[in-house]
Amino acid sequence: MTLEGRSALVTGASSGIGAVVAEALAAAGARVGLVARRKDRLEQVLARCREHAPDSAMWAADLTDLDAIADLAADAERTLGGVDVLVNNAGMPKRRRVQDLTPAEAEEVMHLNHLSPVRLTLALLPGMIRRGRGNLVAMGSVAARLGPPHEAAYAASKAALTAFWESMAVDLDGTGVRVHVVQPALIAGTELFTLPGNEEPISDLSDALPPQEVAAAVLEVLASGRFEQYVPGWFSEMASGKAADVDAFIAGVKEWTRDRLAP
């Protein structure tokens, strides 16, 4: 698809992956709507987007307020002249051993990472179906397919989102609306590693990839129609290996985790 003259709504757009994706979409010719809580940072991203797409707009909104999402979606459609591309990027981490996890923390992660994007998607979907076109992008994680240690709540939320997207891809066949999931690994340039209530990552942070690689993956799935794209791509081989022998995969992750945590 061409993005020239189309509109795109990006959540979690005030920094990190969301900001870079929004700017990439604007540079490709789309009018971009930005959604995040931090108005000051959104204004900075909006200014950069407007260098390419002057009609871009922003909404300072808290997506954990599920009851406000329908009004946000309606306002975005009015302002942007319909939403052709939705990138559900807003989310939160939760890096904690399951024996240290509280029920409230698990629910909070599922609330923002799964229920919120589902609400926004369902609010915008009727307009896409009516127009006979649209692209729904979920920002997943390799954790959705691999279930890494110390990330049970986060992995479950991204797995739920991925499963919803898989079913939706079949349900929307023939409507003109396409469905995509981008599954990033460790990405630099975010603030997620420093948020309170999270353990230090077990993985080596020097392996983190720039968010521009995620933005490139979003543009690629929009252009190709591909359902799922890993960043980096070789994680698809790891996911396939896990599917072939889950017991062996879990045994290997246990050994890797023991080695990483050894004094």
Pin down the residues of each PLM region.
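The beta1-alpha1 cofactor-binding region of Rossmann-like NAD(H)/NADP(H)-dependent oxidoreductases
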Residues: 39, 60-71, 103
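Active-site helix of classical SDR
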Residues: 121, 157
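Conserved glycine-rich cofactor-binding loop
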Residues: 7, 14-15
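C-terminal helical subdomain
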Residues: 181, 201-238
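Conserved glycine-rich Rossmann-like NAD(P)H-binding loop of the short-chain dehydrogenase/reductase
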Residues: 30-45
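Residue(s) in the substrate-gating loop at a strand-loop-helix junction
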Residues: 141
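Substrate-binding pocket helix/loop in short-chain dehydrogenase/reductase
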Residues: 97-98, 105-107
